[in-house]
Regions:
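All-alpha prenyltransferase/terpene-synthase fold signal
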Residues: 1-168
């Protein structure tokens, strides 16, 4: 899986879900096309950011806090942005070992893997990428007139920013 494929996949998954919800709310409200397009862009960017956050939390979150077992994506052989970043940075031997274990669904020592990913900057790069998507979502709102609704949408982006910062 390449990063390009990863981004396409999460845009078609979570990004599209958020985008549809946001754009449909604008369409139902009989807003101009520019507004519904801005809402689509907002939802797509926010949903993509949220999926990256979810992928990061799957590695570094607290099971009590997130209510699910950590490392489930890795157990299923799913490559997420933090792991793709790590594979990019790994030397050929590390890359071979990690890839083989993921493909064969062999257990990985999650704390050690996360430590390596943090040391190599893979986690912070994934968080930074998600933060950029959040910023893009916030920028999409600039096309909307100021209102309580627009401010509520903007506040959602700040909430996601806080979630991301909590992963650092």
């Amino acid at each position: 899986l390449t990063k390009k494929d990863y981004f396409k996949m999460i845009e078609m998954k979570t990004g599209a879900l958020f985008a549809a919800a946001c754009q449909l709310s604008a369409i139902i409200s009989n807003t101009p096309k520019t507004v519904s397009d801005a809402m689509f862009e907002y939802g797509m960017k926010l949903g993509t950011a949220y999926q990256i956050y979810d992928d990061v939390v799957d590695l570094v979150g607290s099971e009590d806090q997130i209510g699910k077992t950590l490392g489930t994506d890795l157990e299923k052989g799913k490559l997420t942005l933090p792991i793709l970043n790590l594979l990019e940075r790994a030397n050929p031997k590390q890359k071979e070992i990690l890839s083989k274990r993921i493909i064969e669904h062999k257990p990985l020592d999650l704390p050690i893997l996360v430590g390596i990913a943090e040391y190599e900057g893979s986690m912070s790069d994934a968080i930074d990428t998600a933060a950029n998507f959040v910023s893009d979502a916030r920028n999409a709102l600039k096309l909307l007139k100021a209102s309580e609704s627009t401010e509520a949408l903007r506040n959602i982006t700040f909430f996601v920013d806080q979630l991301l910062e909590g992963c650092r």
